[in-house]
From Swiss-Prot:
The chain crosses the membrane at residues 121-142, 154-176, 193-218, 227-242, 261-283, 323-348. The gene is KCNQ1. Changing D242N: In LQT1; decreases outward potassium current; decreases plasma membrane localization. This is Potassium voltage-gated channel subfamily KQT member 1. Changing R192P: In LQT1; uncertain significance. The lineage of its organism: Eukaryota, Metazoa, Chordata, Craniata, Vertebrata. Changing I198V: In LQT1; uncertain significance.
Length: 676
């Protein structure tokens, strides 16, 4: 019985390719409990049969054999030796262990939490840090007031201890978590991270706080005046709120975009400030106020007055005394104040445009997943008409591993726990079930009862190994009730559906269903893309209409240019000189003009030929008066046709004002008797 239940040698060799090497066989028990290894279900021959240990009698990925041919014994694949499996178990496709939270993974999550915050958890943490820093700053201000100095100083001392420990620990954690990025790996990478401006500020704040706490005595944070000067470094903690520097980047981008306007306004305003201060100084340098003091004793006093005036502050400490100085000050103030107020408007409009641009970018970014889904579904609809096997591989269920066949009883609770953990990881990473692009369902079929194999009974597994039925043969393994009564009731209540594990098991109704599902997914993706393309503001609608009108006008002008180039301008809108210039061009109008000129020349030549023929006829009639026939008016005689008497019939010719026909220009042929 033992020999019958064990697989053959060749088959055991093939199954051994999907297992761990000898150094990792200690995790075999874990592999039986957690069958979550990656499998090549779409690669290799027969849709991944190289790595899937399927029993010869089970409906696995092997293609069905002919009814008359016996089942061939399993043969090891000759695709070459197995690649080395010295990879980490988290990335190796031969590993049977579930991915664990390694050090690099924890580093990445901590780094994203601290340096690239996204989500409500990160917002709560960083907002709490901002509130703590703000409270510390408020107590620092209160410690300089005599009324609250005693209470604020004692409270601030313990707050400083907590903040120093907190920020020091956070700095060390940031330095450690930066190792998840390639440019911050190792000692030199950590030094590169520590050289960042915000990291330098954090280090200065921590060191300054430690110096303040170490030098202070008797619970007094500000023991000496020197330490009181270092205390102002605590204001740098407010920069800790915006570690990413988004506000500074936004301000820099606005200033860079409007740099030309800002430079122009500041330059003109500075010139107005210098000139107004100088002329006021010349007018007020000898003036004395009511207290007997000279207001503008130096040019520096005039510059101070100019800065206070043109910036609309107006302290009133220096005022012009003479009417000349007041007139100069009023004239230059109106001019200079207008230019000094322009940068505020320029920066305000720049910020508004930047915010609007970001909103449009967000609206455009929402269209990218919808467009990707539409392209993917359209391609799948197109690929559904292709009989290639790769089109249908995504609907094939991966074949079970060998340890799932050998397991004594199913464990549905395990799968539920794994699904919950997976959902939790996806939720932590910011992926919600509604944001997934497209789900590919697996196809199952409802086979007859006699085709169902018992994967939970060892006898059923042994019978499938001992006997390899063909397509027409049916294996009837006996079901062994090794489970409890409650589990048997659960198994009886569920409908067992055999998953399709090979392309050859797909039927026409399966393919038709797949086509219908793909077509429905295409229509849904198309509707979502159309909804994402809708403008979100009235200004966008107006801009779209104006942009469309501009494109229409450009196309109309291009069409008009091509028509003028091919047909030419109408004769009513061009002069004689332009007509003469247009004659040498290749337009249709120029060609028609040349054709008309040629027709006119041809008419003139034909008229000349007709006159010459009439003259010849008249001369011929005058030289043969006795040839017979009645004479014409004017002494001309009418001759007989050449066919009878050898003369030309004048009735064949028309008057000189008409064109001759083809018969008139054709010379009559002589008969055979006339030639002789």
């Amino acid at each position: 019985m033992a020999a019958a239940s064990s697989p053959p040698r060749a088959e055991r060799k093939r199954w051994g390719w999907g297992r761990l090497p000898g150094a990792r066989r200690g995790s075999a028990g874990l592999a039986k409990k957690c069958p979550f290894s990656l499998e090549l279900a779409e690669g290799g021959p027969a849709g991944g049969a190289l790595y899937a240990p399927i029993a010869p009698g089970a409906p696995g990925p092997a293609p069905p054999a002919s009814p008359a041919a016996p089942a061939a014994p399993p043969v090891a694949s000759d695709l070459g030796p197995r690649p080395p499996v010295s990879l980490d178990p988290r990335v190796s496709i031969y590993s049977t262990r579930r991915p664990v939270l390694a050090r690099t993974h924890v580093q990445g999550r901590v780094y994203n939490f601290l340096e690239r915050p996204t989500g409500w958890k990160c917002f709560v943490y960083h907002f709490a840090v901002f509130l703590i820093v703000l409270v510390c700053l408020i107590f620092s201000v209160l410690s300089t007031i005599e009324q609250y100095a005693a209470l604020a100083t004692g409270t601030l001392f313990w707050m400083e201890i907590v903040l120093v420990v907190f920020f020091g620990t956070e700095y060390v954690v940031r330095l450690w978590s930066a190792g998840c990025r390639s440019k911050y790996v190792g000692l030199w990478g950590r030094l590169r991270f520590a050289r960042k401006p915000i990291s330098i500020i954090d280090l200065i704040v921590v060191v300054a706080s430690m110096v303040v706490l170490c030098v202070g005595s008797k619970g007094q944070v500000f023991a000496t005046s020197a330490i009181r000067g270092i205390r102002f470094l605590q204001i740098l903690r407010m920069l800790h709120v915006d570690r990413q520097g988004g506000t500074w980047r936004l301000l820099g981008s606005v200033v860079f975009i409007h740099r030309q306007e800002l430079i122009t306004t500041l330059y003109i305003g500075f010139l107005g400030l210098i000139f107004s201060s100088y002329f006021v100084y010349l007018a007020e340098k000898d003036a004395v106020n009511e207290s007997g003091r000279v207001e503008f004793g130096s040019y520096a006093d005039a510059l101070w007055w100019g800065v206070v005036t043109v910036t609309t502050i107006g302290y009133g400490d220096k005022v012009p005394q003479t009417w000349v100085g007041k007139t100069i000050a009023s004239c230059f103030s109106v001019f200079a104040i207008s230019f000094f107020a322009l940068p505020a408007g320029i920066l305000g409009s720049g910020f508004a445009l930047k915010v609007q641009q970001k909103q449009r970018q967000k609206h455009f970014n929402r269209q990218i997943p919808a467009a990707a889904s539409l392209i993917q579904t359209a391609w799948r609809c197109y690929a559904a008409e292709n009989p290639d096997s790769s089109t249908w591989k995504i609907y094939i269920r991966k074949a079970p591993r060998s340890h799932t066949l050998l397991s004594p009883s199913p464990k549905p609770k395990k799968s539920v726990v794994v699904k919950k953990k997976k959902f939790k990881l996806d939720k932590d990473n910011g992926v919600t079930p509604g944001e997934k692009m497209l789900t590919v369902p697996h196809i199952t079929c409802d086979p007859p009862e006699e085709r169902r194999l018992d994967h939970f009974s060892v006898d059923g597994y042994d019978s499938s190994v001992r006997k390899s039925p063909t397509l027409l043969e049916v294996s009837m393994p006996h079901f062994m009730r090794t489970n409890s009564f409650a589990e048997d009731l659960d198994l009886e209540g569920e409908t067992l559906l055999t998953p399709i594990t090979h392309i050859s098991q797909l039927r026409e109704h399966h393919r038709a269903t797949i086509k219908v599902i793909r077509r429905m997914q295409y229509f849904v993706a198309k509707k979502k893309f159309q909804q994402a393309r809708k403008p979100y503001d009235v200004r966008d609608v107006i801009e779209q209409y104006s942009q469309g009108h501009l494109n229409l006008m450009v196309r109309i002008k291009e069409l008009q240019r091509r028509l003028d180039q091919s047909i030419g301008k109408p004769s009513l809108f061009i002069s004689v000189s332009e007509k003469s210039k247009d004659r040498g061009s290749n337009t249709i109008g120029a060609r028609l003009n040349r054709v008309e000129d040629k027709v006119t020349q041809l008419d003139q030549r034909l008229a000349l030929i007709t006159d010459m023929l009439h003259q010849l006829l008249s001369l011929h009639g005058g030289s043969t008066p006795g040839s017979g026939g009645p004479p014409r008016e004017g002494g001309a005689h009418i001759t007989q046709p050449c066919g009878s008497g050898g003369s030309v019939d004048p009735e064949l010719f028309l008057p000189s004002n008409t064109l001759p026909t083809y018969e008139q220009l054709t010379v009559p042929r002589r008969g055979p008797d006339e030639g002789s």
